[in-house]
């Protein structure tokens, strides 16, 4: 059975809301000659944000597959797949923000970043343990989920402030 793990909704909505908060005013404050261009670029940017946040992971009884969106691939992110039997360990590396990122290490010593911003992450980790026998009990999302919610809230407050300023 193939299971699909999409990018976290809270990640998507935080990026979209931040983009909107930062760019909604631009078409309104640009000079007349650039209004149409700024609207076109605004829509293009929104399309890019939606597309970039559509990467996902698929698991099956045989392998794990990471699929990048078209735009992600355009910017150099690659699709990959690993057979469960080829994963020999998962290594942890600290980030500058105090959390950890994890890499699947294969029998050929290839490294693949373990996706940490996906929905049903705990279920994903259970599948990893089930298929590889590796202990992933202590693994967590790369950032606490409340940070995405806070970013979304602050972005929405910015948008409301912009609307109030525009309407008054």
What are these regions (language model features)?
Residues 11-14, 27-42, 167-168:
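Hydrophobic alpha-helical transmembrane segments
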């Amino acid at each position: 059975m193939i299971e699909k793990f999409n990018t976290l909704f809270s990640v998507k909505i935080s990026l979209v809301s931040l983009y909107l908060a930062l760019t909604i005013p631009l078409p309104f404050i640009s000079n007349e000659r650039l209004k149409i261009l700024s609207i076109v670029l605004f829509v293009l940017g929104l399309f890019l944000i939606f597309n970039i946040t559509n990467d996902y992971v698929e698991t099956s009884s045989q392998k794990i597959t990471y699929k990048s969106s078209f735009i992600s691939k355009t910017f150099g992110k690659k699709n990959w797949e690993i057979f469960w039997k080829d994963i020999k360990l998962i290594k942890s590396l600290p980030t500058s923000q105090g959390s950890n990122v994890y890499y699947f290490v294969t029998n050929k010593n290839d490294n693949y970043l373990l996706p940490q911003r996906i929905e049903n992450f705990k279920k994903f980790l259970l599948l990893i343990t089930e298929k590889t026998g590796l202990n992933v009990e202590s693994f967590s999302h790369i950032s606490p989920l409340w940070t995405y919610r806070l970013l979304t809230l602050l972005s929405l407050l910015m948008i409301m402030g912009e609307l109030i300023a525009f309407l008054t």
